[in-house]
């Protein structure tokens, strides 16, 4: 693996967790597997970013089912992005998609909340519940792949799989071959409170970028209820150490969402330009 890219010209020191009682999370029971009704909505309600080269005007960021009816001829590379537990309402997601569209890169972020009465939670909850959520999120990769293969303006030979937080777990676990690279935001690829086992399945020859705060409130040692071994790093370095095409970026002192931090955007741009040849 490439030596860690540090966002500042100084070493990042992971903060040791303070001793405290594990807080009680909240769980709102509900549906936890997509249905014949929700599957098409996962895609039609997806948030897409479309470059101006296709719109013949301004970049489009909005629902797939409201995108411009006519696009210019041509194909563009695509990033499939899996949102976190808060859904597509997170402002940074649309901003990130708009930014990538200005680089000539299309994005599609499937809507996990297309499932009526979907289960929701605030951490921590039990691992069995988390794993059911992870399985549902993994199914969304196949749902969106089936759809994008029928979209004429997507170059399916140039696709990257990305996700943040809850959405990053299925990115790390994905075992298919539809994507030429992966971007894992705000997930550490380690055993902790969020999984029974991290089950990372990234081939050692697949380009991969992991970006996370050095003090991530959920997956670094800053979290007093992390539930990880004392050797936990708070990033995917251990799982990527055999991958010479992987990099880990730590953003010092950042919050959980790092999508639009300059220290995250620069490596993402370089990573995608290199993979997509743009």
For each of these PLM feature ranges, what is it?
Residues 21-74:
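N-terminal cap/lid segment of alpha/beta-hydrolase-fold proteins
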Residues 74-84:
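Short beta-strand element of the alpha/beta-hydrolase
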Residues 86, 112-135:
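Cap/lid segment of the alpha/beta-hydrolase catalytic domain
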Residues 91-108:
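Short amphipathic alpha-helix adjacent to the substrate-entry channel of hydrolases
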Residues 127-152:
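Alpha/beta-hydrolase active-site loop
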Residues 144-203:
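Primarily recognizes the serine-hydrolase "nucleophile elbow" in alpha/beta-hydrolase
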Residues 181-249, 256:
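The feature captures the conserved acid-bearing segment of alpha/beta-hydrolase catalytic domains
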Residues 241-278:
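C-terminal catalytic histidine-bearing segment of alpha/beta-hydrolase fold enzymes
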């Amino acid at each position: 693996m490439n030596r860690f890219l540090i966002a500042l010209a100084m070493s990042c020191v992971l903060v040791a967790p303070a001793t405290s009682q594990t807080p009680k999370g909240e769980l709102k029971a509900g549906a936890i597997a997509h249905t014949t009704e929700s599957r098409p909505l996962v895609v039609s309600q997806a948030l897409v970013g479309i470059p101006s080269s296709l719109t013949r005007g301004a970049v489009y960021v909005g629902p797939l089912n409201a995108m411009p009816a006519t696009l210019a001829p041509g194909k563009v590379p695509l990033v499939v992005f899996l949102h976190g537990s808060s859904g597509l309402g997170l402002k940074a997601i649309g901003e990130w998609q708009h930014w990538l569209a200005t680089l000539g890169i299309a994005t599609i972020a499937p809507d996990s909340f297309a499932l009526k009465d979907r289960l929701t939670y605030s951490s921590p909850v039990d691992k069995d519940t988390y794993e059911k959520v992870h399985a549902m999120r993994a199914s969304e990769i196949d749902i969106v792949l089936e759809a994008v293969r029928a979209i004429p303006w997507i170059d399916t030979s140039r696709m990257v799989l990305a996700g943040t937080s809850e959405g990053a777990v299925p990115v790390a676990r994905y075992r298919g071959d539809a994507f030429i690279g992966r971007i894992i935001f705000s997930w550490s690829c380690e055993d902790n409170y969020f999984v029974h086992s991290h089950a990372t399945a990234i081939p050692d020859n697949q380009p991969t970028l992991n970006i996370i705060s050095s003090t991530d409130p959920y997956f670094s040692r800053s979290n007093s209820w992390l539930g990880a071994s004392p050797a936990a790093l708070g990033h995917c370095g251990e799982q990527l150490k055999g991958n010479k095409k992987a990099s880990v970026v730590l953003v010092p002192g950042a919050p959980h969402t790092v999508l639009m931090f300059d220290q995250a955007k620069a490596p993402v741009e370089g990573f995608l330009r290199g993979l997509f040849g743009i």
